[in-house]
Design a protein with these regions (language model features):
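Amphipathic, hydrophobic secondary-structure cores in small proteins
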Residues: 2-5, 9, 17-48
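C-terminal structural segments of small proteins and small subunits
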Residues: 52-83
Length: 83
């Protein structure tokens, strides 16, 4: 399984970005920020590569934005890579 998370330093901003994406009919979710990201407020917005391609530029301009991370889960565990 593979997905993208957008990490912010503010829970409020994470929720606003989530609400924006839902309003744009994008499939997304609020998730706990993985420890491997090493930053953030504890909440991140999870979405697909397609959403990143279409809305990445817009949501990266929100205040307190830390970065995008690729999360891959396999039988061997989870890896987190900063994009």
């Amino acid at each position: 399984m593979e997905y993208i998370i957008a990490v912010y330093r503010s829970r409020n901003v994470s929720m606003r970005v989530y609400n924006y994406l839902v309003g744009q009919n994008q499939v997304c979710a609020i998730v706990s920020t993985p420890q491997g990201a090493g930053v953030g407020c504890g909440l991140s917005v999870k979405f697909s590569h397609t959403t990143l391609n279409g809305y990445g530029h817009i949501i990266s301009q929100a205040e307190t934005f830390v970065g995008f991370f690729l999360v891959k889960t396999t039988l061997r565990g989870t890896t987190i890579t900063r994009l």
